[in-house]
Swiss-Prot record:
Region annotation Disordered: where it falls in the sequence: 185-214, 278-303
Biological role: Accessory protein regulating the assembly of the plastid Clp protease system.
Protein name: ATP-dependent Clp protease ATP-binding subunit CLPT3, chloroplastic
Domain of life where this protein originates: Eukaryota
InterPro entries: Clp_N_dom_sf
Stored Gene3D superfamilies: Clp, N-terminal domain (1.10.1780.10)
An annotated GO cellular component: chloroplast
Localization of this protein: Plastid, Chloroplast
Transit peptide, start-end: 1-37
Species of origin: Chlamydomonas reinhardtii
Family: Belongs to the ClpA/ClpB family.
UniProt keywords, alphabetically: Chloroplast, Plastid, Transit peptide
């Protein structure tokens, strides 16, 4: 239909198709340059800081305590607070606790439970729900993705817990970046209302900016506690600029060799025992111990 309505100008049908494709490629490059100009040049994924890795594991544990199979933004918040011990009282979690008047992970979880009506952990199937059964919700993955983008924009060497909190509290810079992306997506939908609308349909949910509900209840909690969000944002940005959290300093090959050696040792110990004396949880416990000692767990991947 498009070819039938297009002017011939002495061109053959093949030449018309070539011109249309070239025009589409030019428009695509123009849009790509607009996105890069607004969001910056894409960089490789940044590593997670030791505190952030611990927070992701703690988020799964908090989901279990709330009888949830999916860890959302609120569980990320609880995970950051639960992992505050790694900051020696000087990290992002400690700053947030101080702003909340000493509110720790347990008190915040109780408040969240009151808002959602959650209760103690329930039985799932034939056994208790375990942290390894919990997955991150799409909203939590979106928060983590925005935190990584914020860390890249700041020139940070890793994704820290302060980046997570900045996103969860709806910091201005993060919202502006998301809004800019939404404007580009909206422009693309309008420009391609003829061909693109028929081929793709409506814009996918991943292109839409997150609603306040997608960021969890941290903003509501700060309002209830009477916290100055601007002052808190300044403190978190100062931690981010200072690089208060660093990626785990470890060699990947050495780490893998250490994990293999540990699990091999556990296997030999269990084989040496009589079958009725073997510990079925030995490998799981060894895996947890090595994960805490070496940094991010493979299950912590969110993409």
């Amino acid at each position: 239909m498009l070819l039938a309505n297009a002017p011939h100008n002495g061109c053959s049908r093949l030449q018309q198709v070539t011109l249309l494709r070239a025009s589409g490629a030019k428009l695509h490059r123009k849009r790509a340059l607009t996105v890069v100009a607004r969001t910056g040049t894409p960089q490789p994924r940044l590593p997670l800081s030791t505190q952030t890795s611990a927070s992701l594991r703690a988020a799964r544990e908090q989901a279990v305590l709330q009888s949830l199979l999916f860890a959302g933004p609120d569980q990320l918040l609880l995970g950051v607070l639960a992992g505050s011990r790694l900051g020696n009282g000087k990290g992002a979690a400690a700053v947030l606790e101080a702003e909340l008047g000493g509110g720790d992970c347990d008190s915040v979880r109780e408040w969240l439970n009151e808002q959602s009506g959650s209760t103690a952990a329930k039985l799932q199937g034939s056994g208790w729900l375990r942290p390894s059964d919990v997955e991150f919700s799409p909203a939590a993955r979106r928060v983590l993705s925005l935190a990584e983008a914020g860390a890249e924009a700041m020139g940070s060497s890793s994704v820290g817990t302060y980046h997570l909190l900045l996103v969860l509290m709806g910091a201005g810079g993060e919202q502006q970046a998301v809004q800019a992306g939404a404007e580009v997506a909206s422009t693309e939908q309008v420009d391609g209302s003829g061909m693109a609308a028929n081929s793709r349909g409506s814009t996918s949910g991943s292109e839409q900016p997150p609603r306040d509900s997608d960021l969890g209840l941290l903003r509501s909690l700060l309002d209830v506690a009477g916290v100055d969000r601007t002052a808190l944002e300044v403190k978190l940005l100062a931690l981010a600029e200072a690089g208060a959290e660093m990626p785990p300093a470890q060699d990947s090959q050495a780490t893998a060799a250490g994990v293999v050696a540990t699990l091999t040792s556990v296997y030999r110990q269990q084989v040496a025992r009589a079958w009725h004396e073997r510990d079925d949880n030995a490998f799981r416990q060894a895996h947890q111990n090595t994960a805490m000692a070496t940094g991010p767990d493979p299950d912590d991947e969110y993409e």
